[in-house]
Amino acid sequence: MTVHVSNCAATAEDPVSREIRTESGQREVFCGLTGIVWLHRKIQDAFFLVVGSRTCAHLIQSAAGVMIFAEPRFGTAIMEEKDLAGLTDANIELDRIVTQLLTRRPDIKLLFLVGSCPSEVIKLDLSRAALRLSQRFSPGVRILNYSGSGIETTFTQGEDACLASLVPELPAAQDEKSSLLVVGSLADVVEDQFMRMFDALGIGPVQFFPPRKSTALPSVGPNTKILMAQPFLPDTVRALQERGAKRLAAPFPLGVEGTTGWLRAAADAFGVDPAHFDKVTGPNRARAERALAAYRTELADRRIFFFPDSQLEIPLARFLSRELSMKLVEVGTPYLHREHLAEELKLLPAGVAITEGQDVDLQLDRCRLARPDIVVCGLGLANPLEAEGITTKWSIELVFTPIQGYEQAADLAELFARPLVRRAKLVA
């Protein structure tokens, strides 16, 4: 069974030479603290302690949809005015809070001290605090730090900073046998599906980063092959490559085509016979293709505009244009790593407008002029655009929702069809 690909055929255009507009100006994005929402669910024995303001606390609690009395595995050490004014020693108070937290929550095995805009403004050295507290609480608890500040970042970079801080803690691989390391947070159900697929293909050993438990960190070394599951992890991948790992060039596992290309990259690296690959993946590909057919009818020829927000924009645009026949008006992305996204850029239709960075006023002008059928954007832009009669899809929902793999291809398509159906019902 071959995947449906619309007439926007893959171009031979060099992705490096493809024309990409770069903009710099006012931006509309969440900060990296947002990554805690999915990371605290993924690493089940970790706790994320944000050193920040009440605004930081409200952001995370609202985004996670969890009441604080439910004792989630995240919290905020709130910096008061006296801390910001330098009238107190913030390190003493931080030590007290961490001690209280670890005494109350003995299940915590990994503690992240997460920097924020306020803590960085007053130059609070969380790396030194993490080292000091690690010496005190080791070996029972590992304490690390990273920045979730919103200064010059977008919200998915929080995961990159978190995982990059964890790379030095990974054990060195002792086995000379090749291993596969899937890098990037995936929902447990998606991870299990991919694990079954790798087992059926005879690929292994396979490890996932981040792991579900911090006590089961994957090993890394010169024989480790990296398969990126998320496109927003350049610092993490660089740190792994410095440990000797080698990245496999592949599209990202969104849709049938992307998932097949992603799995094929691993299969080729591990010498899997092409006939065996087709035998293992064929039924899943056929089932996913049938599930996509209904949404293709709804989405074909619909015009879509991407504001830069999540860094998922390029793979999503490829999926929507090639598998669902949508028309790309403009594809904006906060940052574009040309090497990591080279396989995706090759598959975009020739001449598509790609924008790196953001000048939100200019992009709003272009969006209003184009009047697309649907706009993918952040929460801050969605309501104003909806008020103007433009249908929107929240980009952050595409990060929170399991969308990778064959089984989720139709779910991903539905995320774009649903707002259009809702708009049609409201108009009717």
Curated annotation (Swiss-Prot):
Keywords: 4Fe-4S, ATP-binding, Bacteriochlorophyll biosynthesis, Chlorophyll biosynthesis, Iron, Iron-sulfur, Metal-binding, Nucleotide-binding, Oxidoreductase, Photosynthesis. It holds the Pfam family Oxidored_nitro. It comes from the Bacteria. Pathway: Porphyrin-containing compound metabolism; bacteriochlorophyll biosynthesis (light-independent). Its EC number is 1.3.7.7. Its cofactor is [4Fe-4S] cluster. GO terms for biological process: light-independent bacteriochlorophyll biosynthetic process; photosynthesis, dark reaction. The keyword Membrane does not apply. Binds 1 [4Fe-4S] cluster per heterodimer. The cluster is bound at the heterodimer interface by residues from both subunits. GO terms for molecular function: 4 iron, 4 sulfur cluster binding; ATP binding; metal ion binding; oxidoreductase activity, acting on iron-sulfur proteins as donors; oxidoreductase activity, acting on the CH-CH group of donors, iron-sulfur protein as acceptor. [4Fe-4S] cluster binds at C31, C56, C117. It catalyses: chlorophyllide a + oxidized 2[4Fe-4S]-[ferredoxin] + 2 ADP + 2 phosphate = protochlorophyllide a + reduced 2[4Fe-4S]-[ferredoxin] + 2 ATP + 2 H2O. InterPro entries: LIPOR_BchN/ChlN, Nase/OxRdtase_comp1, Protochl_reductN. The keyword Iron applies. Protochlorophyllide reductase is composed of three subunits; BchL, BchN and BchB. Forms a heterotetramer of two BchB and two BchN subunits. PANTHER family: LIGHT-INDEPENDENT PROTOCHLOROPHYLLIDE REDUCTASE SUBUNIT N. Component of the dark-operative protochlorophyllide reductase (DPOR) that uses Mg-ATP and reduced ferredoxin to reduce ring D of protochlorophyllide (Pchlide) to form chlorophyllide a (Chlide). This reaction is light-independent. The NB-protein (BchN-BchB) is the catalytic component of the complex. This is Light-independent protochlorophyllide reductase subunit N. It comes from Rhodopseudomonas palustris (strain BisB5).
